[in-house]
Amino acid sequence: MGGQRQEKNNLDDSAVLESITSQWWSFSSFVPLVSGALWLWLAASSGLPAVLLGAVPGALLLGTGLSGLLWAVESRTFQYMALASALGGILSVPAIFVIGPVGALVLGLGSAASFLATGYLALGQHRCPASVPAPDTGPALAARAAVNELMMCGLILTSWPVVVGTIAVRVQREATEAYALFEEMNWFSEPATYHKNPPPLEEPEIETVEHRGREIERLTFDSFYEPHEDEPGRERWLSYRRNPTVCAWILRHKDEQRPWLICVHGIRMGTLNKSLLRFQPEYLHEELGLNLIMPVLPMHGPRDPGGLISGERTLSGDAMDTLHTGAQAVWDLRRIVWWLRQCEDAPTIGALGHSLGGYAVSLLASLEENLDCVVAGNPAVDPSHLFWANAPAIATHSLSAEGIREETIKALLRPVSPLALEPVVPHERRAIFAGVVDRVVPPVQAHSLWRHWDEPRIAWYQGAHQRFIRASEGREVLEETLRAADMLPEETTGTASHSA
């Protein structure tokens, strides 16, 4: 692309840990290969209903197994292998009626073995910086890695729009226009100046609802966020219905003033039930005694313009939409910080984020001086790499044909990159934790943020993406950081010694 800015990759691209892999693990690809062949053979021998039932899992297992043995493998291979294994396990139940109980049992066991093999194959390709603890290599951790591959497959397959054809042409045009504007405004060299100061949040609407025995407040307000006047994609962003209305859920103690923790969810989250599941109020609210506010990120939950799949546009490759998601997220969070401090008399305010929420609170820590501490869990600090490494090949090929590469999107997102901005939260009050076998947000992203933040406290747990604060290591580093910010008294402890 003409005039394209060459941007250095901020990620710490370390070599694969030798201690993770075994030369025999590569032969695990025989498991899905044989399982897929069995699916196709038994289905072909049992009539048309069996063929219709077994064609998809059989073809996918056979294809991904062959790919693992004969061709270069990548994240997409493991994702579709995990999908095929899960489909095979599910469809082995109705296979009882069209293939027979013995055949169905064989197919079910083969699919389960293929799922476990997927985890081992993924671990064999897992990239980790040298300072990250080596993961265990037992079947439990391999199964968690396979679950992560299945999650990522579902996330990518439900992303919208698919950047092909005219959409890829538009992405290229907007990127070209944005480069010229950002260079002119010095937003590449001074990314903090891209962000406008949001107006105070003085009178949000608050209603109280009962939810599963809890009294929860629902806070809503108009975001008032708008992209810069001449930014490409501005009118499209402003056209998304429901996104301008910010929603947040509040759990507060009514006996006295308590510290406030802003809990920011990950991608495809944003509903009340998912927020409560992820941030475990029985631990954060009841045991640690914190007031919680759980805002919904742009384009998620009740703010999703389509209303079908929460956050489907966030990792679609539509670069300007991704940029505006980050910019509006930190805008909304800064308004919430102001409201807590000025209207709720919050003595201290911290932020805890998971995945995409880890990215959002990392960005907040670079722009909001009234934030007392920040803890980023499994932070997805490089969305461009996550898209390019996992998107369907048809999308990346279409973008490449238009002159768009991973580096193009990475450079364009520099104004909303925590790896390009300097943190304003003090060093002793920022922390990171992540799983050593996270296959959704690889450990290299947390490690890169740790390096950029001058190596604050960090914790690694033996687990994958979803474990988050159920991991004792995550709870320990969270509580240490809260104490450093005077948000917990020294004698207060939660259940950091317990792991789920």
Segments and roles (model prediction):
Residues 439-445, 470:
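Conserved alpha/beta-hydrolase "acid-adjacent" motif
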Residues 2-233, 499-500:
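N-terminal targeting or regulatory segments adjacent to alpha/beta-hydrolase or S9 domains
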Residues 425-426, 431-434:
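Short beta-strand/loop motif that positions the catalytic acidic residue
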Residues 265-328:
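Cap/lid segment of the alpha/beta-hydrolase catalytic domain
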Residues 360-409, 460:
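Hydrolase active-site cap/lid region
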Residues 344-355:
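Alpha/beta-hydrolase fold nucleophile elbow
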Residues 258-266:
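Short beta-strand element of the alpha/beta-hydrolase
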Residues 464-475:
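Catalytic histidine-centered segment of alpha/beta-hydrolase-like enzymes
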